[in-house]
């Protein structure tokens, strides 16, 4: 099985992460670094083209990567798993406007027009949602409420380190 892993905002594709190692037990895992400050249209196009070019069977994404997985997976007909997904990035990304350093030390600038253009989580695809109840960024209860009518949503206890690292 070919698995595409899509990292979250301010992170990077790290082949040594526990999530990647866990996914490697299921198949071949590929991914790429994504600059979310470039906007939804560019990110979507990059991930879609990457998925098409790598014969992907499953997309797994975390946080904003889970959001992106919902759009790419739904539009390409590829099953996806969204872990602690951002469901309304046009709201949640407002906290990161301006110029900052991300989790890996790179500088990014996030503009309000870029944030406002992010659509909500896409429903209608073949997906599964996993939420950690203690996630500090994505509200698990909101995710459960919003996505349960559309997807199987699995809630895990607080601090599941292999999902949040």
Give a label for each model feature.
Residues 5-9, 60, 130-132:
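Short hydrophobic segments within beta-strands
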Residues 16-20, 69, 140-144:
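Short, highly selective alpha-helical patches that border small-molecule cofactor pockets
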Residues 58-60, 80:
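Conserved alpha/beta-hydrolase fold motif
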Residues 79-165:
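The alpha/beta-hydrolase serine catalytic core
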């Amino acid at each position: 099985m070919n698995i595409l892993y899509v990292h979250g905002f301010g992170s990077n594709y790290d082949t040594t992460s526990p999530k990647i190692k866990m996914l490697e037990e299921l198949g071949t895992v590929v991914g790429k670094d994504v600059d979310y400050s470039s906007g939804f249209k560019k990110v979507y196009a990059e991930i879609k083209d990457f998925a098409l070019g790598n014969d992907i069977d499953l997309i797994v994404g975390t946080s904003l990567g889970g959001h992106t997985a919902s759009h790419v997976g739904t539009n390409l007909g590829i099953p996806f798993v969204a872990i602690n997904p951002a469901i309304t990035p046009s709201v949640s990304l407002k906290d990161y406007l301006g110029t900052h350093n991300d989790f890996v030390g790179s500088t990014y600038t996030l503009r309000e027009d870029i944030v406002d253009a992010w659509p909500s989580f896409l429903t209608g695809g073949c997906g599964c949602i996993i939420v950690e109840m203690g996630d500090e960024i994505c509200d698990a209860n909101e995710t459960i409420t919003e996505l349960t009518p559309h997807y199987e949503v699995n809630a895990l206890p607080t601090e599941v380190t292999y999902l949040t690292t």
